[in-house]
Amino acid sequence: EGIYMTTATDPYGEWSKPVNIRPGAGWIDPCPFWDEDGKAYLVAGVAKSRIGYKSVLHMVEMQPDGMGLIGEEKIIFDGNLNDQITIEGPKMYKRNGWYYIFAPAGGVKTGWQTVLRSKNVFGPYEYKVVMRQGDSPVNGPHQGAWVDTVTGQDWFIHFQDVYAAGRITHLQPMSWENDWPVIGVKKDGNDYGEPV
């Protein structure tokens, strides 16, 4: 059990033997992040079924080559202390001096998209719900990522759970207001977007 790292010079070629960089159960949805100064970090959620608790995000510094961790793991966000229950699936970015972690919360079928931000990689992080189902038929917008194109457009790709049909992929327009992302379209004066 743990988080493993493997490398290859060609994605179709031979992969190295996996190295367990974080032994033990519990961490899920790991996301590596390389900062402008060359330092690297690993952020991840946790699964209650494997570790006994949920709704927190952990972070630890990582060797720049990804082959090991440096220092102690830290809880950087605890969704149990606010309304971000079941926060998971973090994706980390940096923009305009802000560290951002995009993470869904509330569960796959009825959840929402939350974004955390901080000027310090280890926080403290403030958060904002940036997309909810609202009046859209797209339930629980979940497990997404920011896509910034070479032409300067921003998009958000995520899935929707549609029971027997599986997980349907959606692409939402994304823009920025006051250094917070706006995903989808805002309606009725809401502070969050809805899927289009």
Indicate residue ranges for each PLM-predicted region.
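Carbohydrate-active catalytic/glycan-binding domains of CAZyme proteins
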Residues: 1-196
